[in-house]
């Protein structure tokens, strides 16, 4: 089974990054939780993945996946986005160099670039997902 290696950088502080290895069969919901955890944030807000990387035009993305798409039964208005619970990593990232913008917390707007940097074969001795590398100190999620 193939694993995907990602480099995730804070959008406005690119020197802070995490490398994560995860199965391509994992959902975007699962991946979002791993990204947030790698930065020591609480996984307690809505989020989305967007193909428009510019930072301020992400809602104009051709491809977008949001938690809101999975909350229709809770009275959330459709945003035109696809499901994060039903979409797999392998459905979104196909080639090394593919990037998406990850937005966590629509109030505080934590933005990350998520780039596929490689593929590996599963190692039975490793538990996945795995944080492969941490560079830089993660900022505090809340300035209390």
PLM regions with names:
Residues 1-144:
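Short linear regulatory motifs enriched in tryptophan with gly/pro/ser
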């Amino acid at each position: 089974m193939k694993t995907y290696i990602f480099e995730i950088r804070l959008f406005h502080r690119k020197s802070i990054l995490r490398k994560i290895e995860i199965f391509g069969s994992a959902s975007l919901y699962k991946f979002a939780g791993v990204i947030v955890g790698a930065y020591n944030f609480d996984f307690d807000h809505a989020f989305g993945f967007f193909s428009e990387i510019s930072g301020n035009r992400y809602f104009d993305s051709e491809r977008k996946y949001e938690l809101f798409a999975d909350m229709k039964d809770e009275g959330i208005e459709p945003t035109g986005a696809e499901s994060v619970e039903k979409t797999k990593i392998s459905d979104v990232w196909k080639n090394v160099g593919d990037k998406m913008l990850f937005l966590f917390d629509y109030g505080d707007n934590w933005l990350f670039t998520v780039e596929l940097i490689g593929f590996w074969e599963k190692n039975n001795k490793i538990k996945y997902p795995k944080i492969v590398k941490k560079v830089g100190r993660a900022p505090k999620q809340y300035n209390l």
